[in-house]
Amino acid sequence: MQTGQIIRALSGFYDVQSEHKIYRTRARGNFRKRKITPLVGDFVEFESESQTESGYILEILDRKNEMIRPPVANIDQAVVIVSAVEPDFSLNLLDRFLIYLESLNIQGLVYLTKTDMISDEKYQEIKQYLDYYEKVGYPTFAPRTAFTPEIIQAIEDTFPDKTTVFTGQTGAGKSTLLNHIDPKLNLATAEISQSLNRGKHTTRHIELIPLNDGLVGDTPGFSSLGILNVTSETLVSRYPEFREIGQDCKFRTCQHVMEPKCAVKAAVDAGEIMQSRYTNYLQFRAELKDIRPVYKKSK
């Protein structure tokens, strides 16, 4: 029996990396009976006679996290790709995804693409927004000139000893960026649907690729995103700046809405917390309160 990590899943097969070798495997039949699905990123115990013959996954080891969209396990960090235009830059969509990452204890990074398609004035506006995200704990990359050796190196420097996924809105340029990081990847790039101002999905499967002493994955994009893995009560803890400043609120359980002597609301008024972050927070709370619980029917 050996241990390794699933780096690719395709058509019922799972490629497992173990000691720098790749083994093709299938999941044992009892996984289906136990309603367990192996995920890319899973650490597994498996058996295989050789690299040329299919082996079997025997057990999935405990996951430290599991992304639903995309379905990947044991992720250390996620580079969220946002475009300046086509599709349009959206703070709301960025906040939704960062909230999701916070809920899974995944470090979020933000990379801005298509800056060559906007004016200097628009670039400075977006850059000011992203500077705020950098300040509250999300490393950001917003190059005025795309794909310079310096910016590619800066991204690569985050890879060692980590499993990283690249994700973001469809058509924002995830695969294009990865192609510049390593041209051998030759990943398909997206075309933009002009009528919807959204991209066409091009990444068909999920794969982790060894890059710069780490594993990197390009994942299928999304054109919209609900609020995942959070409730109206836990939402407040998904904002790192709220967690820090909220310690000075009068009430320990302050939700920063109607409560008196709220340090977060005071920080918004003082310009210490970006207004859009708080506005989106209130919107997300309202959306979550409208979600009705789904109850399983009794047999």
UniProtKB/Swiss-Prot annotation:
Primary location class: cytoplasm
SUPFAM superfamilies assigned: Nucleic acid-binding proteins (SSF50249), P-loop containing nucleoside triphosphate hydrolases (SSF52540)
Pfam families assigned to the protein according to its UniProt record, in alphabetical order: RsgA_GTPase, RsgA_N
Give the enzyme class: hydrolase
Q: Which cofactor does it need?
A: Zn(2+)
According to the UniProt entry, what is the EC number of this protein?
3.6.1.-
User: What remark does the entry make about the cofactor?
Assistant: Binds 1 zinc ion per subunit.
**Positions of Zn(2+) binding:** 249, 254, 256, 262
Q: Which GO terms describe its cellular component?
A: cytoplasm
Q: Which UniProt keywords apply?
A: Cytoplasm, GTP-binding, Hydrolase, Metal-binding, Nucleotide-binding, Ribosome biogenesis, RNA-binding, rRNA-binding, Zinc
Question: Where is each CP-type G domain found?
Answer: 64-225
Q: Give the InterPro entries listed for this entry.
A: G_CP_dom, NA-bd_OB-fold, P-loop_NTPase, Ribosome_biogen_GTPase_RsgA, RsgA_GTPase_dom, RsgA_N
Q: Where does GTP bind?
A: 113-116, 168-176
Signal peptide, first to last residue: none
Tell me which Gene Ontology terms the entry assigns under biological process.
ribosomal small subunit biogenesis
State where the protein is found.
Answer: Cytoplasm
Q: Name one GO molecular function term.
A: rRNA binding
Q: Which family does it belong to?
A: Belongs to the TRAFAC class YlqF/YawG GTPase family. RsgA subfamily.
Function, in words = One of several proteins that assist in the late maturation steps of the functional core of the 30S ribosomal subunit. Helps release RbfA from mature subunits. May play a role in the assembly of ribosomal proteins into the subunit. Circularly permuted GTPase that catalyzes slow GTP hydrolysis, GTPase activity is stimulated by the 30S ribosomal subunit.
Complex formation: Monomer. Associates with 30S ribosomal subunit, binds 16S rRNA.
Q: What is the name of this protein?
A: Small ribosomal subunit biogenesis GTPase RsgA
The organism's lineage? Bacteria, Bacillati, Bacillota, Bacilli, Lactobacillales
